[in-house]
Amino acid sequence: KDIDFANPANGLSTLIYTSGTTGNPKGVMLTNENILSNIESVRRMFGELEKTRSLNILPWAHIYSQTCELYYNLLYNNSLAICSDKSEFLNELKEVKPEALYLVPRVLELIKDKTQMIDKPVIRSVLPLILSRVFGGNLKFIFSGGAKLNADTKRYYENNGIKICEGYGCTETSPMVSVNHFESPRNVESAGKILDNVRVEIVHGEIQVNGPNIMSGYWNNEKKTDEVLINRNYRKWYKTGDSGRIKDGFLFIDSRIANNYKLSNGKFVNVEELENDIKKYISGPFIVFGENMLYNNIISTTDVDIKVINKNIDGYLKINNNYKITVEEFERFYTPKLSVKRKQLVNYILNNDC
């Protein structure tokens, strides 16, 4: 007897609002097929990861943790513990002893900063053992998503025996597009291999994605939907707004196109590259901005030696000023995935004479 499904494959499964880092949040409509096809694509790469235990710290209101952590582990009968409070995460790692973790770059950076303080020559040789104990002693790999992971942070973990499976995707792609496996073949400098059943093309430098994981559109926002969903060769493609390249089957993410800008002297600034170059001179969170200005500027929570930075970067990238605010002020502009709402933060600085 045929079964009448209450919610068919093309029926709405979830409505997830983007974090609004580049504008107003938009409701992303994802169907059952979108999510299930993405889970199947991940399964083809990793297998069912049977009897894997993990500890949740990320909000399930976002598709990365919802699809990759919640649905995937429920589907394959894995154990999933829920952290009682973010402040207890490190303590509960020792109790749960997870074999897999699903984290965002900011969490990995915070743990790196805590453990790096003990990275002294006399104990450097035992740092892998110390890190292993921090994560409970049974950790096999960490999935990192939600934003691009800093290369230095990735190398820190990899060099100390912890495999980082960095992936790339968007809410609009349900979310996974590519991911690095914890076994060969892998390229830790990349965002991994493109998943089965997902197509990626680079069009004028922009990453565009096609597949059954592409959203049906934005809720009650046909204009924005038409801006990002295009038809090409009888296929629906999603314009990610990210620049990147493909080499040897691996996807490399360069920057968020909307974050880049031109100075008033006509010089183009790749913000993420510049931030990565000067990160070693700044303690704590910060961003760079300077659109339509003569020089770049920094917003940070600490004092910054601008002279030292300018000695070590190209002249046209010169930093003019550091707008110092409190940690509490800066944290107001974090999304739930701990990325920064850049435009809102810059507007706050410029409108409040910080």
Model-derived segments and spans:
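Conserved AMP-binding A3 loop
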Residues: 13-39
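C-terminal boundary motif of the adenylate-forming
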Residues: 241-243, 280-304
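Conserved pre-ATP/AMP-binding loop-to-beta segment of ANL
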Residues: 2-17, 24, 47-53
